[in-house]
């Protein structure tokens, strides 16, 4: 691969969903359309939402206002990858009135999933406003999250948390 990322036993897919703010409808529709499709192979989903501030990179062990449990092994794998890279990542949850990430819909549908966020839940002025634009993204926050994600994939590829 161009970036030197080589996985021998792992296929990576990308799911782009919409309508998280409208009851997780995009993720729920995807889950319904692909129900049972991945039952024969170890599969996990990492759902990213508002990766902005590197000081708030967090693996959410609970989602949907704290009412839905994320997969502990998937959450732990992301945390272990961050620790190995010495990238600060906190164990957290999407709190009451904090909403949800698509991870909640994936978990409710039976997928092994966790949500990763990078925002202050005291909500900044860019969150869900007209200031929530591509040029308000934080390169350092995205780079750290990307590095941890690659490390987690490499660990999974070698048999971790399957």
What are these regions (language model features)?
Residues 1-70:
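Acidic/histidine-rich catalytic neighborhood of metal-dependent amide-processing enzymes
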Residues 51-162:
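Active-site-adjacent substrate-binding region
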